[in-house]
Amino acid sequence: MNQELSTNPFNPVAPVKTFDEIKISLASPERILSWSYGEIKKPETINYRTFKPERDGLFCARIFGPIKDYECLCGKYKRMKYRGVVCEKCGVEVTLQKVRRERMGHIELAAPVAHIWFLKSLPSRIGLMLDMTLRDLERILYFENYVVIEPGLTDLTYGQLMTEEEFLDAQDQYGADAFTANIGAEAIREMLSAIDLEQTAETLREELKEATGELKPKKIIKRLKIVESFLESGNRPEWMILTVLPVIPPELRPLVPLDGGRFATSDLNDLYRRVINRNNRLKRLIELRAPDIIVRNEKRMLQEAVDALFDNGRRGRVITGTNKRPLKSLSDMLKGKQGRFRQNLLGKRVDFSGRSVIVTGPELKLHQCGLPKKMALELFKPFIYSRLEAKGLSSTVKQAKKLVEKERPEVWDILDEVIREHPVLLNRAPTLHRLGIQAFEPILIEGKAIQLHPLVCSAFNADFDGDQMAVHVPLSLEAQLEARVLMMSTNNVLSPANGAPIIVPSQDMVLGLYYTTMERRGMKGEGMAFSSVEEVEHALAAGEVHLHATITARIKQIDEEGNEVVKRYQTTPGRLRLGNLLPLNAKAPFELVNRLLRKKDVQNVIDTVYRYCGQKESVIFCDQIMGMGFREAFKAGISFGKDDMLIPDTKWPIVNEVRDQVKEFEQQYMDGLITQGEKYNKVVDAWSKCSDKVAGEMMAEISAVRYDDAGAEKEPNSVYMMSHSGARGSPAQMKQLGGMRGLMAKPNGEIIETPIISNFKEGLTVLEYFNSTHGARKGLADTALKTANSGYLTRRLVDVAQDCIVRTHDCGTENAITASAAVNEGEVVSPLAERVLGRVAAEDILVPGSDEVIVARGELIDERRADLVDQANVASVRIRSPLTCEAEEGVCAMCYGRDLARGTLVNIGEAVGIIAAQSIGEPGTQLTMRTFHIGGIAQGGQQSFLEASQEGRIEFRNPNLLENANGEQIVMGRNMQLAIIDEAGQERATHKLTYGAKVHVKDGQTVKRATRLFEWDPYTLPIIAEKAGVARFVDLVSGISVREDTDEATGMTQKIVSDWRSTPKGGDLKPEIIIMNPETGDPMRNEAGNPISYPMSVEAILSVEDGQTVRAGDVVARIPREGARTKDITGGLPRVAELFEARRPKDHAIIAENDGYVRFGKDYKNKRRITIEPVDDTLNSVEYMVPKGKHIPVQEGDFVQKGDYIMDGNPAPHDILRILGVEALANYMIDEVQEVYRLQGVKINDKHIEVIVRQMLQKYEILDSGETTLLKGEHVDKAELDEVNQKAMDHGMRPAHAEPILLGITKASLQTRSFISAASFQETTRVLTEASVQGKRDKLVGLKENVIVGRLIPAGTGGATSRVKKIAHDRDQKVIDTRRAEAESAAALAAPTDGVIDLGSEDSGLVETVENREE
């Protein structure tokens, strides 16, 4: 009985196996034999007549255990009483059948065989150990070449390969015993077992000190690393060659009889059978002393069979089964989505679950869901059985079963009792963030569909068009508790991604609330006064006052002191009704709803109520406004017909005007005044402006207020109400219905020049319809592809961040990052208050210009403090950030700040990494699904000027202006900025001026809002003459570096610089334009005294002729920028992935590494050499090679600052980290990622991105190993590095020097310290091979590892319980230790001592550990 109890997984009394870590290492032959219960000698599986397993076969009962519980094979011993007896007839132990899942067997191999993982998994471990190439190894292993193992006194060298003939010749020459050479895995095994690891490591270290060059040290380091890992892990190299092959238990490779006498079997049995057959044949051949060549062939076949068993298809052809299907080997069992890790360990199927279609349940409360009776009966069966038994209605489970099956009335009563206050979990796939699973209290309903509360739809992303949801029942009391306290829908009002309420009315509800809070002039009852809400309701019911009439009413309010007061408001009956639902609170006054409520406003109202009135009040409020919204929308009866789509009368005049404009552009193009590209850009611009104008007219007409004959205001247009309230439809969609559809994009993103002038109400012409199919089709294709991409991005993010958990309250770091308002193209896109909200201040925040403290250091910035910061016009704030957190594992609560979904400081144990990954990944899918709604409509129109967004005084920084012949100011510098300063001297906006921009304002001038500040050409980059003179062409040779483009349409030609490097003659050309002094014929010089020359880049269009006189400020040439591509998240998702994968962009920008002056050096082949001479003499000058023909925005003698771009393009994030540091990198990543999401109107809090970037910065690269064991170029964790360096410094040795490196999320996940987590992510075999050689230990710190080994995760309640357990265990340990010490001292007193105890004896009682061995 005892055994059964201890191995039964559902037995609560069985002691749980406790362990703190899991180690993986190589198995020695002895170890394999110790696992084995017997040798498998025959390839037979089972006897096909009796269906009994064959003796000594792959399913042998003697080795693996009985087939039926407590019954031997021949049937001599049956039942429990013979437990443990071994039958003398069939040799089977009488025990549980379950042991067939755990007992292993083995095969004694007749010849050693190399393990394919250590041979072929790159870099080949066997190859590294022996310092041989993989090709040579394979030649030896597959019996092509001999290898010299012991050269003796001959001229041969160790490890030399020889062919058969050479071997025989050498034997003739030196004699057979003069040297040893061998072939096959035996040879490799001999060589491996001869290796003295410590000696090798010493030699390699010596070599490393002397090695020079690039490759040699690298190679030595690689070998040294693997030798060290063998030394540390206690593995022996020869264990990579197998002499004994383990056989996994038969139940894990089952053989199942199908009907009709056929069998289904696991592929492994086939693979094992091949191995056994070949092995037995080889044994026989060796006994028979067969010719060498035959034995050798058999050995090679054995090697191939074992290879196929371990990893089919890794080498040679794939071994296929009967139906030409590749057999699944042991490696394939682990790999991929269907492998052991992802299919069975991380994703299990769950008992007590059901699924059904969902329908809306508007009469439910927020914490309820409707559960069909039939489903509930099935799900809660065990509970019902136990309750039936407790009530004495049934005495056995069988009886209870019958009762339930008959659905007797008492069963329904009991079901009611069972379900009361027993929450269930509802889940909708795909579960993209944690709000995809929430708990509800079930309400029993008739019918077969689950009823879902309408307000939680947005969290689940559910709608009622046939979606299905799954129900799960939390069984244990703890699970029910967690479901209620943590997962109840009422506890998840705020979104973890941005902290805004996610329980927000949508669609009908919004429309109803909008209609309720409308105010219209001239309605019945206007100007009446009411004393109370009840009176208003009375008047409404009597029809004396209209819902939208303006009235005066007295309303109860709470003042600042908390007293109840009555205030008078001018309002409408509708708003009064809504105000009556607001909880009474000074912070939620009636003014909150005394206005026209759109969707955003409703969200703000809910947010305010949640922040100030608490959770309970706000949940009740949400339920009430939901009911009101539905009711009022239903009463209003808003709907629309085709006549509600208004087409503005001014549409055709506008269109015709633009048509004339476009004709004019065509004419200019024919006359050659503009290029094809410029014409295209201008036409696209004109049409896009036209489309906007028509849309504007339509919106103006549709939203215009109209009056009836009596002078009362009419109801607004229904379509306008729907769109304006935020219920459904966008201005872009309305534009397509009633304005003009506008420009369309081709599938590659280019915009088609001819727009669609019709709208859907007028109907499209055939050509227009054809043009619009591109966009529609691209939308659908995009969706399908990007759902997968987005899911994969989320998977990688979760994997990299899964072990980032809040572990401590405060790490006490001094580091912080600076937060300031996010500005995009001069416009504030997210104010400072928004960015610091929910963060901890790292320094006191002061009112500018005084020392009044707004927020003290270490305080959490809540809404109130954020508003104070905003009002005080603080420019930037130092805040704590997960990036700079110095917690050993995970992050600390102070650096993370507020838990966005709770609104308080984050709790210890919160899995912030996963929350961050889900918050970034979840919108990815949403965005992908949003591309086609607008159907590929192009957003044309490039901005070409900038207007002041604020009033203030203009201030130029680093001005560098030139006035051209027309008196316009042209920007000539790279670093010029224009700032707008307000009266208080605070900077309100700064704009970077691009080279060639025209400035319309003067320094110190005061500007109003919308004053045009400067303009630029969005399509080309001009190159401008600094001084007047004569242009002279250098190396601009027609046909080599210049091509003349003649436009077929116009007959005009223009000169374009072509790629001169691709022509045979053009290798050394340096095309440029020099400005000459017409008097002296010398080149003109600039202030720095350098000759003025303009190097040309490829595709530049020349605007002057050779020898033409130019004036200062004239355009010499124009470089075209890329045409207007449509911005679509298509660019977005890959962009986000590219940022997190830290890929180097193709033509990445070159960033200056220190401040200094630019010098152009001697050119090298087709690259130009730029050096920066630093201002600081202690630094060396840095050289950059830039491909010729790339536009370089700096000139000889320019001063550049550290971090300036010397070559345009996207910067590589690694460069930013190296040159400007972690904070600059974080800012870059945050801005770039947020930019993508902002375009789609998705809000994500910065801290999520910071958490992911923190996980990407976990590793350090060793630059100099000092006197530590770390090797140069190795990547180590910060914790490891500190530990090693501390140890070195304690011993007075030189510490290693390292710098942080940025890893992409895939790389970072694969390099995590936990091999279980890495193996379950990607490249399983590679990760496991590496881990086993190093003898890695998995400390089980992350979530994934713990899920895989079947424990509670160390986050949330799991973390708390494990902490409590640890405390208890330590306490017990202390007691046990003191008891033991007491007992020992008592024993010592009792024992007589003769003479002095020798304390210096060998046995000092210390266990030899790694630590005291080093001393």
Curated annotation (Swiss-Prot):
Binding site for Zn(2+) 2: 811, 885, 892, 895
Catalytic activity: RNA(n) + a ribonucleoside 5'-triphosphate = RNA(n+1) + diphosphate
GO biological process: DNA-templated transcription
Positions with a binding annotation for Zn(2+) 1: 72, 74, 87, 90
GO cellular component: DNA-directed RNA polymerase complex
Presence of the UniProt keyword Transport in the record: no
Cofactors that this protein relies on: Mg(2+); Zn(2+)
Function of the molecule: DNA-dependent RNA polymerase catalyzes the transcription of DNA into RNA using the four ribonucleoside triphosphates as substrates.
NCBIfam families named among the record's database cross-references: rpoC_TIGR
HAMAP family attached to this UniProt entry: RNApol_bact_RpoC
Protein's name in the database: DNA-directed RNA polymerase subunit beta'
Source organism of the structure: Cereibacter sphaeroides (strain ATCC 17023 / DSM 158 / JCM 6121 / CCUG 31486 / LMG 2827 / NBRC 12203 / NCIMB 8253 / ATH 2.4.1.) (Rhodobacter sphaeroides)
Gene: rpoC
